[in-house]
Amino acid sequence: MTTTDCLQQYRDSVLEIEFFISEAHIKDASGNFIHPEKFRDFVISSAVVRFSIAWETFLENIYCAFILGEKDTQGGVVPCCVSVSNLDQAHKLLIGTNKYFDWINPDLVVQLSALFLNPDNPIKTAINSTKSDVLDLKTIRNAAAHMSSTTQQKLDSVASRLYGHQAINSKVSEVVSFVRSDGKTQWEYLRDLLDVATENIAKGVV
């Protein structure tokens, strides 16, 4: 998969997610939601999980592309410290002796780049600039996937910081729909932030 393909696949996934969100929030002629709140909340939670998966998939794919020597979207080559002959080997190299790699963990992603890429590399640069927001996405994703006392507490912590006051029993749909001071919802903010990050990584921007 080329770096252009990696970026396009990510963006196609996000567009599909936004379509589902839009469909869930259709209103009738009177301005009332067609679907009940419980349905809309379900779609939002599912969308957050899918969004996280799209981001993680992009990171794994772009790592493999760099390791295989694929050119970035600007025509350059991201220097790599290892060499593999095929995609399967690239995936195995990234996973190592683990059963899987935690692509939503920004610290681990940066550590991985230090093993296989030059010290200054596009993945490290992009991840370091988005770390706190990716951690927020991880918190929201975990709550969307499985609400427990632990995930609820962490979601409330994110919500409290966003709202500027203590939040209790926050809902995923409420957090991602929160309108920030810049006029964007939290969903729009994360969507735009990671779109820039994925584009810069694919471009090889250090």
In which residue ranges do the predicted regions lie?
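Histidine-centered, metal-coordinating catalytic motifs and their short helical/loop contexts
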Residues: 129-156
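A cross-kingdom marker of C-terminal helix-rich interaction/assembly modules
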Residues: 2, 165-206
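Short, charged amphipathic alpha-helical segments flanked by flexible coils
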Residues: 67-87, 152-176
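Long, hydrophobic, amphipathic alpha-helical segments used as structural scaffolds
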Residues: 55-70, 145-155, 198-206
